[in-house]
Every structure is written in C-alpha cells, then in structure tokens.
C-alpha cells in the first residue's frame, strides 16, 4: 500500500505560474497560451498513463466542441501520421484541445494580477489497484467532490513505478 498523501495548491497569476503550462505538464502534452503566445511542451513525460476532463453542468457547450478545421489540421500533422493508433491520437488531440480552450477562457476571464486561476490537488493511489480501479475511483471522487459542485476538473493519473498519483 502506498503512503497516503494529499496536497492542495493554488495556481495563480501572483506567483508567476502559468495555468496553461501547468495543464500541459499535468497531461504530458503541448499547449499554447493564447494570451502570451507561449507554447509549453511536455510530451516526453512518460509517467502520464491516463488523462481526463470533466466539465460541470453549466460549462459552455462550445468548450466541449473541437472545430472541424482543427481536426483536419491535426490529421495532416506529422504527430498524427506517425501515431500507431490514429483513433487514440485523435481522441487525445480533442481532449487536449478542450483543456487548452478551458484554461485560455479562464485566463480571458480572470484578469486580476492576483487572480486564482485554479487549484492543484495531488493524491496517492494504492499501487495494488488495477489501472481501471484507479480510474473508476478517481472519476467518482472528482465527480462528487468537484464537478457536482460546479467545477471543471482537468486531471490525470501518473505512474512513477511504485508511486501512482492523481494530479
């Protein structure tokens, strides 16, 4: 059984942190901050084994849609062409696009220099659980704790050998 830990941090402008960069790191992916033009690359993070975005009921529908033009552009990309599983690559692209859109919309809304843009929660998972048990437990926990209370949740499971955690 892993040693339990649960850490909560605030991601805000005042500390110079980038919510886009934090999400890219969390998801082991590439994301662009539309406000600054900065692109965050974390595609070499191999410990990301599962990622999800759970939207609350009142989240705008357009945050959940990926424009057809963006899909066509991705399907022409080297990243898509080199993918062993094209369907999985397309789903990952759509999910990353939705997350990037969510956080860029937060940045457009929260302009204050001391704005709290999001909260980061990290907790351990029992290493004895199967991947599916980890996903099921985490999904249920996040749904009840955050999404049902009107929050969106951008989360992933990281597997660092004998340390498995949700961030």
Label each region the model flagged.
Residues 1-167:
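N-terminal nicking endonuclease/strand-transfer module with a His-rich metal-binding environment
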């Amino acid at each position: 059984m892993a040693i339990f830990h649960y850490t909560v941090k605030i991601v805000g402008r005042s500390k110079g942190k980038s919510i886009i960069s934090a999400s890219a790191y969390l998801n082991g992916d590439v994301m662009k901050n539309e406000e600054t033009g900065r692109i965050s690359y974390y595609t070499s993070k191999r410990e990301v084994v599962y990622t999800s975005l759970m939207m609350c009921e009142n989240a705008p529908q357009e945050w959940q849609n990926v424009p057809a033009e963006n899909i066509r552009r991705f399907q022409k990309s080297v990243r898509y062409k080199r993918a062993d599983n094209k369907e999985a690559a397309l789903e990952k692209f759509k999910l990353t696009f939705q997350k990037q859109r969510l956080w860029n919309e937060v940045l457009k809304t929260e302009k204050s220099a001391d704005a709290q843009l999001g909260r980061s929660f990290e907790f351990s998972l029992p290493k004895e659980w199967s991947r599916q048990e980890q996903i099921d437990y985490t999904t249920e926990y996040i749904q009840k704790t955050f999404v049902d209370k009107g929050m969106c949740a951008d989360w992933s499971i990281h597997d660092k050998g004998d340390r498995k955690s949700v961030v």
